[in-house]
Design a protein with these regions (language model features):
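Class I S-adenosyl-L-methionine-dependent methyltransferase catalytic core
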Residues: 1-185
Length: 185
């Protein structure tokens, strides 16, 4: 699906939302205000905001058996996707040593943003560049890495190109984040 069709699918899926996504220089740009809906069905600190995955999947549909969730703490187990998280027995900085390379077409990542966040999770801060290399190894050529973070991680332009940048905020007193979507070259 080309990028404009992804945008159109998003706007058709959410017709009441403002049309805040657009295409510029072969890159989806936009802003999402998620709102103050606190019905996320988990007590886990830092879980995806309510509606986040529905919005993402309107742009990049779940690919059964070809989707990986990194830092997947609150997601239920499913036969449709695999998970890497400190509570699954896979380490985010070494998982490509176990998972076969060129396996996934879609990877969604929501890493801890800071040392303070890691204190809440009970884990250590990750090295984003190492996790990126691990994701590169298991992602198929042409596959997509959707990275939700407060920073743009270091990446190699010979390995990835950015195809989307979407700012995201929940509501007042919440951090701004950015959804950066990479395509593996």
């Amino acid at each position: 699906m080309d990028l404009q069709k992804r945008i159109d699918n998003y706007h058709n899926t959410f017709p009441k939302f403002p049309k805040t996504l657009y295409l510029s220089d072969e890159c989806i740009l936009g802003m999402w205000v998620m709102g103050n809906n606190y019905t996320t069905k988990t007590d886990l600190y830092g879980a995806y905001p309510y509606g986040y995955l529905k919005r993402i999947h309107a742009l990049f549909p779940l690919i059964p058996n070809k989707t990986l969730h990194l830092f997947s703490g609150s997601l239920p187990d499913s036969e449709d996707y695999d998970k890497v998280d400190f509570n699954t027995g896979f380490d985010a900085e070494t998982f490509s040593e176990i998972i076969p390379h060129n396996t996934y077409e879609l990877i969604l990542a929501d890493p801890p943003y800071s040392i303070e966040d890691c204190d809440h999770y009970g884990c250590c801060m990750i090295k984003r560049n190492i996790v990126f290399k691990q994701a590169y190894n298991v992602l198929k050529s042409g596959g997509h890495l959707i990275w939700l973070d407060q920073v743009l991680p270091n990446y190699k332009k010979i390995e990835f190109k950015i195809i989307a940048r979407i700012g995201m905020v929940k509501s007042t007193n919440h951090r701004f984040r950015v959804i950066t979507i990479f395509e593996k070259n």
